[in-house]
Regions:
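Short conserved micro-motifs at the rims of enzyme active sites and ligand-binding pockets
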Residues: 489, 537-538
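Short, locally clustered residues in the helix-turn-helix/winged-helix DNA-binding domain
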Residues: 42
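Short coil/turn segments at secondary-structure boundaries
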Residues: 6-11, 51-56, 552
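Structured alpha/beta or helical-core interaction and ligand-binding surfaces enriched in interleaved
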Residues: 506, 539-542, 550-556
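Interdomain "pre-motor" coupling segment immediately N-terminal to P-loop NTPase/helicase cores
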Residues: 1-21
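Inter-lobe coupling/hinge segments of SF2-like helicase ATPases
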Residues: 19-31, 35, 39, 47-488, ...
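Acidic, polar loop-rich interaction surfaces within structured domains
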Residues: 492, 506-508
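Short proline/glycine- and acidic-rich turn/helix-capping motifs at secondary-structure junctions
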Residues: 508-518, 554-564
Length: 564
């Protein structure tokens, strides 16, 4: 088996734990709801055959403890377990939970692995010594001796989709592996993907749901702040209502989280003399201002400019003539630091976390209430448990509703539901404030009511009426190259051979929304198949008739997760 470039490091070899001890009463801490869910899954598990189960439940409902019990059962049967996470950032806190639950350290597989440690892990996996392996998506391809259980945690997360160098969705590939090797796979989420719920409706998957929080704390109260009625001070982005509530939380020694899913200080810099917008030399995207490193940075290719003594390339004016538009996490930090000068504030984003150790320290400090205010990007939504956090404020709840992504409403609901779930996970009920310029939007309204199931029913009906995934199939063909003329010629060749098939629509070619990426020009076709045919065969037959152009790449993306 050829392994992809891997993601991981080896912790330690500890096979001293007796697998029967894992089932002793001291490990069984499930409440009645969890026990019923565990029993249902175990009946399917003991059939020793392929099955896909969705383990569903709101944040804090105890999904992890349920599948821990199944892992214990799997170990007692001398079989291996694989837990996939969408991001390695989840593993640090999670490793401790695994060690406490099972009494030994799991093997870990992620991007920091060295060749020597890679060999050790693969040896343990092949020999069967690796009882539990936690990994990012490429761990799926490891050659397990006797894999008996596969867990895909946060199965809805779009980062399971690898977008470059061999496009695949690790969640879907995990289901394929389980079906081939005949074992149980459990998909876990508080906000399942619409694809998974559709498969449940089609009787392909089994749905098991935990209805209540483990702690019995009420769900957080959600308040919508209509920003059209709010007059913000200059250079301010946080409403007075939200700031006043933060002040009350500070007085009670409770924590607040401000969420904005934009890295850096400002997403766009403009010369006020001539209107020039600073863009990447390799990509058709704006450079983002980062105060931390005094640079303008492209988030697609890493190209950067020093923001000290900048000169406009169009008119030659210097840095005192530039305006920053929009807000990122650093701009919110500046505002909150002015407003609450004595508060201990933590910035929680990939730019402000240097290593896994740094991440662990920040998570531990937040857990121990050593920070008063946390300002974070999507990284903060990833399964963390902070018992003192009782307020979440979303700076721009509408941000991801904009654009042409068919999954925009679904992704927005999932992200906001997950970040809302950080509030009130301890003994004190939580509050959530959503700053929105479109409070009448149905996605925002459903979130306020915490009516998740109603949102999913409506969203699936919209997809059915429009014949969009998951009801129908879509694929993208991206044609890219460094020479724009050659890319155009290749697209013309494809257009001349476009198949004419009933219930198959082919759109394009058209410039991709990100028309230049890492120095390559990009055009795309979109294939929309409505009747359940094998879309791969349609594309294969089409491309086989078209000669390849030297220097031009053709990339096929089945079920695209983004449309850039």
């Amino acid at each position: 088996m050829i392994l992809p470039k891997s993601e991981g490091y080896f912790i330690k070899d500890d096979d001293s734990k007796n697998s029967q001890d894992l089932l002793s009463p001291k490990y069984l801490k499930l409440n009645e709801t969890q026990s019923k869910a565990r029993a249902k899954i175990e009946r399917i598990f003991l059939q020793n055959d392929y099955s896909t189960i969705l383990l569903d439940g709101m944040p804090g409902s105890g999904k992890t403890e349920v599948y821990f019990d199944l892992i214990a059962k799997n170990i007692s049967r001398k079989k291996q377990s694989l837990i996939l996470f969408p991001e390695v950032s989840l593993t640090n806190e999670f490793i401790k939970r695994v060690e406490e639950r099972f009494g030994f350290s799991p093997d870990i597989w992620h991007s920091k692995i060295t060749p020597a440690k890679k060999r050790k892990i693969i040896e343990r996996v092949i020999s069967g010594k690796s009882q539990i392996l936690i990994g990012a998506r490429s761990a799926l391809f490891l050659p397990f001796k006797n894999l008996g259980l596969l867990i895909v945690d946060e199965e809805h997360d779009s980062s399971y989709k690898q977008e470059e160098k061999g496009i695949y969705n690790a969640r879907d590939m995990a289901v394929v592996r389980a079906s081939i090797e005949k074992f149980l796979i459990i998909l876990v989420s508080a906000t399942p993907s619409l694809e998974t719920l559709y498969n449940i409706n089609q009787k392909k998957y089994t749905h098991i749901k935990l209805e209540n929080k483990f702690s019995h704390t009420p769900e957080p109260k959600i308040k919508i702040i209509n920003m059209k009625n709010v007059k913000l001070k200059k250079n301010n982005w946080v409403s007075e209502d939200l700031k006043k509530t933060m002040e009350l939380k500070l007085a009670k020694k409770e924590q607040s989280l401000l969420f904005i899913n934009k890295r850096g200080f400002a997403p766009m810099i403009i010369c006020k003399s001539c209107g020039h917008k600073f863009t990447c030399k390799n990509c058709s995207s704006y450079l983002v201002e980062h105060l931390k490193d005094n640079k303008l940075l492209c988030h697609h290719c890493g190209y950067k400019l020093n923001s000290f003594k900048m000169k406009c390339p169009s008119c030659g004016n210097t840095d005192d003539s530039f305006i920053d538009y929009g807000a990122g996490i650093e701009k919110i930090y500046n505002e909150i630091s002015r407003e609450f000068p004595s508060a201990k504030i933590c910035l929680f984003s990939s730019d402000h976390i240097q290593s896994n150790e740094d991440l662990s320290k920040k998570v531990e400090k937040i857990y121990n209430n050593e920070f008063d205010i946390i300002i974070g990007t999507q990284l903060i939504t990833k399964g963390y448990h902070f018992p003192h956090l009782t307020l979440v404020g979303v700076i721009d709840a509408d941000m991801t509703l904009k654009g042409g992504d068919l999954r925009a409403a679904e992704k927005t609901y999932q992200m906001l539901y997950q970040v809302a779930g950080r509030s009130g996970r301890g003994d004190i009920p939580g509050d959530v404030y959503l700053q929105s310029y479109f409070p009448e939007n149905e996605t925002i309204q459903d979130l306020q009511k915490m009516d998740r199931d109603n949102f999913y029913v409506k969203e699936l009906n919209i997809r059915k009426k429009a014949n969009l995934p998951p009801v129908a199939k879509m694929a993208a063909i991206i044609v890219s190259g460094r020479n724009l003329h050659e890319v155009h010629e290749s697209c013309l060749n494809l257009s001349r051979s476009t198949p004419n098939i009933d219930n198959v629509d082919i759109y394009g070619p058209a410039p991709a929304p990100l028309s230049r990426l890492k120095g390559r020009h990009r055009q795309r076709f979109l294939i929309h198949e409505k009747k359940g045919r094998k879309i791969q065969k349609i594309i294969q037959h089409w491309l086989s008739k078209v000669p390849q152009t030297s220097g031009v790449n053709i990339t096929i993306d089945i079920d695209p997760q983004n449309f850039t």
